[in-house]
A protein has these predicted regions:
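Short helix N-cap motif at coil->helix boundaries in the Bergerat
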Residues: 19, 101-112
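Short beta-strand/loop element within the Bergerat-fold HATPase_c
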Residues: 77-89
Length: 171
């Protein structure tokens, strides 16, 4: 829950994280769904050997929540792309789907607790409208932000942005 996410703020850990390993391990949670729905999944890390110091549990939870939403709101057989980029002490992890997209009037509300867009209430998506709120709360705890760009009827991209302090790439 969101309260659990807030309570975890006091226990931020610093782990050595290879970004390719983070993406692969998070996506492994969806392996059955990927195969069942015949998804075309692309993972990319730039540069390939990128490594940071950060809270693995929080980064993993954020990524799992974003990927989970991408699966919920896009059809079987569609493409899902996850790209992690480390450049100039800035980490960005983007999750792009070919789903239904988000109407402009819903964009400002999607990170609110318990908010679900009207079309998702009528779909068999499950969930309670907490995933994006939790992801954003965890991103804030790490000093970052989650942004969204969406074209209604075409798809969405959710991006975690973290400024990493110093030369050690810390998150």
């Amino acid at each position: 829950t969101l309260n659990t996410a807030r309570n975890q703020a006091e226990t931020t850990s610093k782990d050595s994280i290879f970004l390719d390993q983070l993406l692969i391990e998070c996506m492994s949670e969806f392996q059955f769904l990927i195969e069942q729905e015949e998804r075309d999944v692309h993972l990319q890390v730039i540069p390939e050997s990128a490594r940071i110091e950060g809270d693995y549990a929080k980064l993993s939870r954020i990524l799992v929540n974003l990927v989970n939403n991408a699966f919920k709101y896009s059809a079987p057989g569609t493409k899902l792309e996850v790209v992690a980029k480390l450049e100039n002490n800035q980490l960005s992890i983007s999750v792009t789907d070919e789903g239904q997209g988000i109407a402009p009037e819903d964009l400002e509300n999607i990170f609110k607790r318990l908010y679900r867009v009207e079309t998702s209430r009528n779909m068999k998506t499950g969930g309670h409208g907490l995933g994006l709120a939790i992801a954003r709360e965890l991103a804030h705890q790490l000093g970052g932000e989650i942004t969204v760009s969406s074209q209604y009827g075409i798809g969405s991209t959710f991006t975690l942005l973290l400024n990493l302090s110093g030369n050690e790439n810390k998150a």
